[in-house]
Amino acid sequence: MSEQETAGSLNNSPSGDGGKPLILPVKGVMPTMGNNCFVAPNATIVGDVVMGDECSVWFNTVLRGDVNFIRMGNRVNVQDGAIIHCTYQKTGTTIGNNVSIGHNAIVHGCVIDDNVLVGMGAIVMDNVHVGSNSIIAAGSVVLENTKVESGTIYAGVPAKKLKDISQELIHGEINRIAENYVMYSGWFKDPAPPILPPVGGEGNGEDQIRR
């Protein structure tokens, strides 16, 4: 997809009020995305950000590829209020496939492998490597240089290994959430909903405006 096509696709993301996400180039580098992605109208994506297919970037999120790069695989969902950033001249941020970044989480200058759930409000700091099939529990703080083992749950402040993950949890939680967010994003790509009838059901509605 060309830079012009990408910019158009991002800027034309669906919204109920006609709003558009804030998409900005940094040093001439424009964010790009794959096929069938959704970007909420008040999300912000800037600079050297590359998204794969079927990704979703939700309301009030910020992806700042200004001081370094951000790379996202396929089927990554960045939920409401989350922030993804990187560190100047040190660490970019790389996120694999089938990854969920929970509401208000912060992911900064790290590597997250495939099939990972970063819980709501969690913080993943610079030079962290989160192995595949893992969960970072809600509210956890994963300190710099931590190596999260594959197939584990890390929790706490600072985050430590809590336990190994069963296959049932991988399929029932990590995969389920990623699949659901692909489905949710599809709801916003449907044709615009019909105009609702005026309050009270009569007249042209001009005298029924809620105050």
Model-derived features: positions:
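Glycine-rich hexapeptide-repeat left-handed beta-helix
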Residues: 2-29, 66, 72-74, 80-87, ...
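A positional/architectural concept
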Residues: 32-77, 81-87
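Short proline/glycine- and basic residue-enriched helix-capping loop/turn segments at helix->loop/beta transitions
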Residues: 100
